[in-house]
Regions:
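Conserved RNase H-like, two-metal-ion catalytic cores of nucleic-acid enzymes
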Residues: 1-122
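A short, charged helix-loop
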Residues: 122-131
Length: 131
């Protein structure tokens, strides 16, 4: 079972310093119209040990310097599925530049040319045999 840590606003400096090599990342927003109407509401990170960090950003100022230091760190690979939305939301609200990303949807389209099924559900089923 995964260990889950919840944070309001930002991760701690200790957590930021503990994140090495690669992390999985996903975001949630109040909708898809960013920045016109919707806001970034949740950031989820999982480290290489399966430890999950759930960050609820401060929607008044979106200050998260420790998280930004991780997102901008070129030595840490950020892995996610269909990162276009996540990356743009993080960059807009946190005023940062997310570096060194690996998008599993793009990788699927490049490598799995035998199908047009590139959704996360399809990848999990094919590679992990899970539904």
């Amino acid at each position: 079972m995964a260990k889950i840590h919840k944070f309001q606003g930002d991760i701690t400096k200790e957590v930021a310093n503990s994140l090495k090599e690669s992390i999985a990342i996903d975001t949630e927003a109040t909708g898809l119209q960013i920045p016109e109407r919707d806001k970034l509401s949740l950031i989820q990170i999982c480290d290489q040990n399966g430890v999950v960090y759930i960050i609820q950003p401060d929607r008044k100022n979106y200050k998260a310097p420790n998280l930004v230091s991780v997102l901008e760190n070129e030595k840490i690979l950020k892995i996610g599925h269909f990162l276009r939305f996540d990356k743009s939301a993080l960059e807009y609200f946190l005023k940062c530049k997310v570096k060194n990303i690996f998008d599993t949807k793009i990788a699927s389209k490049v490598v799995r040319t035998y199908t047009d099924q590139h959704g996360l559900k399809n990848l999990v089923y094919e590679f992990c045999n899970k539904t």
